[in-house]
Regions:
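Reductase modules of NAD(P)H-dependent flavoproteins
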Residues: 2-3, 141, 148-246
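Generic structural signal for buried aliphatic residues
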Residues: 38, 89-92
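Conserved beta-strand elements of the Class I
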Residues: 110-113, 217
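Histidine-anchored nucleotide/phosphate-binding helix
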Residues: 121-131
Length: 246
């Protein structure tokens, strides 16, 4: 059996000239946990050209969704950015990853801290009803350079809170905090500074980050991951994995 499925592109949305998302069909046998990533790509000269992409859609949806940057000289993204509805892409059969709520210890508040396309796995997690059963508050922070890079802003602000099944719990438990670094906006600053200064929690009316009650997931640039990991470790947070919850 092949390690990949061929899926048909259903739609493509170009957020900016550097950012796009797309949906595809989903093989009925594909199973994944919200927060997982999988290998996706295109066939080039008869061979698969693949990269790891987080799945932005929830695991109960009948389609798959992915969020991607555009890199003109990127081996895959230089081609992927030109896909259209009806095109075929390759999707791995074995999604995996550690950004899964089940790998966290119980807590009161879940912080999801993302920069850029690091938002993708958290879009899956905030659409999962079980997330709201495990935590009283879910704080989704998305840091970008410019306002138009706030992908899924309207979905998070308007559509999810009015969702037929998720609307009530999203409205009462999810706190969306978009922040911008290079343009004027209601929230400004890098996530690392917002966390370190205490401004993030203050703006949200939340207590200071506390490993006794708070759980944190981070996804984004290597520099952001490194800085936040160090910052959180200094505050007493312990990194979890598939065998030891954190």
């Amino acid at each position: 059996m092949s390690a990949f499925n061929e899926e048909r592109v259903l739609g493509v949305h170009h957020w900016t000239d550097r950012l796009f998302s797309f949906t595809t069909t989903r093989d009925a046998a594909l199973r994944f946990s919200n927060g997982h990533f999988t290998m996706i790509g295109l066939r080039v000269d008869g061979k698969p050209l693949l990269r790891a992409y987080s799945i932005a859609s929830a695991n109960y949806e009948d389609h798959l969704e992915f969020l991607s940057i555009k890199v003109d000289d990127g081996p895959l993204t230089s081609r992927l950015q030109h896909i259209r509805a009806g095109d075929t892409i390759i999707v791995g059969r074995k999604p995996t990853g550690t950004l899964v709520v089940d790998y966290l210890l119980p807590g009161r508040r879940l912080y999801l801290l993302a920069t850029g396309t690091g938002l993708a796995p958290f879009m899956s997690i905030v659409r999962d009803p079980e997330t709201y059963e495990k935590f009283e508050h879910i704080v989704l922070v998305h840091g970008v350079r410019k306002v138009d890079e706030l992908a899924y802003h309207d979905l998070l602000v308007e559509h999810l809170p009015s969702h037929e099944f998720l609307g009530d719990i999203v409205s009462s438990q999810m706190h969306y905090y978009p922040t911008v670094t290079r343009e004027e906006y209601r929230n400004m600053g890098r996530i690392t500074h917002l966390v370190e200064s205490g401004r993030l929690c203050a703006d949200l009316g939340m207590p200071a980050l506390d490993p006794a009650h708070d759980r944190v997931m981070i996804c984004g640039s290597p520099a952001m991951l490194r800085d936040l990991e160090h910052m959180l470790e200094q505050r007493g947070f312990a990194e979890g994995n598939t065998s030891i919850p954190g």
